[in-house]
């Protein structure tokens, strides 16, 4: 399996619960390296631009409202099969359907406040990482 990078966002609900460290520990235990990280409070424009792919979906406004409701922790993760590994760690989008021991099962409250975002493919990972971390801010280690 190849070394990949993926984008991860710890959403406002999980930041408010003070579980960033617990989530980071799961990334690292799974062999993922955090190669870039920052805490930000997204502007409405940033959230709308980042989630533009969902603009026509009925949940778009609620998603944007949620993502600007508090600070988020954004990180680029790197490792063998990082995209699939992170998605396995996150669990199903709906925490009620997420496997026990996944981030969403343990820390999320609802399908809307579902604790984390992760890139779904190599192409989206590249776009999402570039959105938040221009090349000079990502460090291979």
UniProtKB/Swiss-Prot annotation:
It is found in: Cytoplasm. Keywords: ATP-binding, Cytoplasm, Kinase, Magnesium, Metal-binding, Nucleotide metabolism, Nucleotide-binding, Phosphoprotein, Transferase. Its main location: cytoplasm. GO terms for molecular function: ATP binding; metal ion binding; nucleoside diphosphate kinase activity. It catalyses: a 2'-deoxyribonucleoside 5'-diphosphate + ATP = a 2'-deoxyribonucleoside 5'-triphosphate + ADP; a ribonucleoside 5'-diphosphate + ATP = a ribonucleoside 5'-triphosphate + ADP. The active site is at 117 (pros-phosphohistidine intermediate). ATP binds at residues 11, 59, 87, 93, 104, 114. Its cofactor is Mg(2+). Its EC number is 2.7.4.6. It comes from the Bacteria. SMART domains: NDK. Pfam families: NDK. GO terms for biological process: CTP biosynthetic process; GTP biosynthetic process; UTP biosynthetic process. GO terms for cellular component: cytoplasm. PANTHER family: NUCLEOSIDE DIPHOSPHATE KINASE, NUCLEOSIDE DIPHOSPHATE KINASE DDB_G0292928-RELATED. Belongs to the NDK family. NCBIfam families: PRK00668.1. Homotetramer. Major role in the synthesis of nucleoside triphosphates other than ATP. The ATP gamma phosphate is transferred to the NDP beta phosphate via a ping-pong mechanism, using a phosphorylated active-site intermediate. This is Nucleoside diphosphate kinase. It comes from Cupriavidus pinatubonensis (strain JMP 134 / LMG 1197) (Cupriavidus necator (strain JMP 134)).
